[in-house]
């Protein structure tokens, strides 16, 4: 006899229900993978357990891309066939769509942070790992580019500072050279002003007759001693007669 048709109904035993759910879920994911490989189709499968736990499967394409594609397609068709009276309904559906998208993004964010990974299959974990590796490559590439640009900017500033220092050093040397030349010129002028004037030549000097009186001549001191060294003593001599006029007078008398 052939096997009878199994009646589908809710399994009352919680343990049996959980075991059946795990087996059927694995078989369903396997069938989805087979159809995606054999038929080259994009498949997205979402399953929620009776406790609200999420299980999903997608092909090599990202789950978000498949859902966005489905939403665009279904929303465009609904817009074509929906009457104007269903505008409020469309807004409600749009709200639900955005809400589901936010929940999906939050879940992916938790996955990227390494949280809530228990419900993910090995295939999903592998896809997540590939996405993280790609993100790390982009991050490292961007970081290296920023560091390279920063080094080039610092080198450019260093070159500009070196050129400025060279120009300032050249200006300082030129200024010192000018100051040194001015100092030498000033020293030469001061040296020429401090030198005594040269004495007049002796052979061209003419003695005036009246200058002969400054030559020493014999004196007759009748008031006291004469000291040539002390000028004050000369004032104490009331009578200092020169012998030269007397001598000249006597010679004149004898001659007459």
From Swiss-Prot:
A single GO cellular-component term on record: nucleus
Subunit annotation: Homodimer capable of binding to CArG-box sequences.
SMART domains reported for this sequence: MADS
UniProt-recorded name of the protein: Floral homeotic protein APETALA 1
Any one GO molecular-function label of the UniProt entry: protein dimerization activity
SUPFAM superfamilies: SRF-like
K-box domain: residues covered: 88-178
Limits of the MADS-box domain: 1-61
Gene3D superfamilies documented for this protein: Transcription factor, MADS-box (3.40.1810.10)
Annotated segments matching region Disordered: 180-206
Annotated compartments: Nucleus
This protein's UniProt keywords: Activator, Coiled coil, Developmental protein, Differentiation, DNA-binding, Flowering, Nucleus, Transcription, Transcription regulation
GO biological process terms on file: cell differentiation; flower development; positive regulation of transcription by RNA polymerase II
Primary site of residence: nucleus
Role summary: Transcription factor that promotes early floral meristem identity in synergy with LEAFY. Displays a redundant function with CAULIFLOWER in the up-regulation of LEAFY. Required subsequently for the transition of an inflorescence meristem into a floral meristem, and for the normal development of sepals and petals in flowers. Regulates positively B class homeotic proteins.
């Amino acid at each position: 006899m052939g096997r009878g048709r199994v009646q589908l109904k809710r399994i009352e035993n919680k343990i049996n229900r959980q075991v059946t759910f795990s087996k059927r879920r694995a078989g369903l994911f396997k069938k989805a993978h087979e159809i995606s490989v054999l038929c080259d189709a994009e498949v997205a499968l979402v399953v929620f357990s009776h406790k609200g736990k999420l299980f999903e499967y997608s092909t090599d394409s990202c789950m978000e891309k498949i859902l966005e594609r489905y939403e665009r397609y279904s929303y465009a068709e609904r817009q074509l066939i929906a009457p104007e009276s269903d505008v409020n309904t469309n807004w409600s559906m749009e709200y639900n769509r955005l809400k589901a998208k936010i929940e999906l993004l939050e879940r992916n964010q938790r996955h990227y942070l390494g949280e809530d990974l228990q419900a993910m299959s090995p295939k999903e974990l592998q896809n997540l790992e590939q996405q993280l590796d790609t993100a790390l490559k982009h991050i490292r590439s961007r970081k290296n580019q920023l560091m390279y640009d920063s080094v080039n900017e610092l080198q450019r500033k260093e070159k500009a500072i070196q050129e400025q220092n060279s120009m300032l050093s050249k200006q300082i040397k030129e200024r010192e050279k000018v100051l040194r030349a001015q100092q030498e010129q000033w020293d030469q002028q001061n040296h020429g002003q401090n030198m005594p004037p040269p004495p007049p030549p002796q052979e061209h000097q003419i003695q005036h007759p009246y200058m002969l009186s400054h030559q020493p001549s014999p004196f007759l001191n009748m008031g006291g001693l004469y000291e040539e060294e002390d000028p004050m003593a000369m004032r104490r001599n009331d009578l200092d007669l020169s012998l030269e006029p007397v001598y000249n007078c006597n010679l004149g008398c004898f001659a007459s």
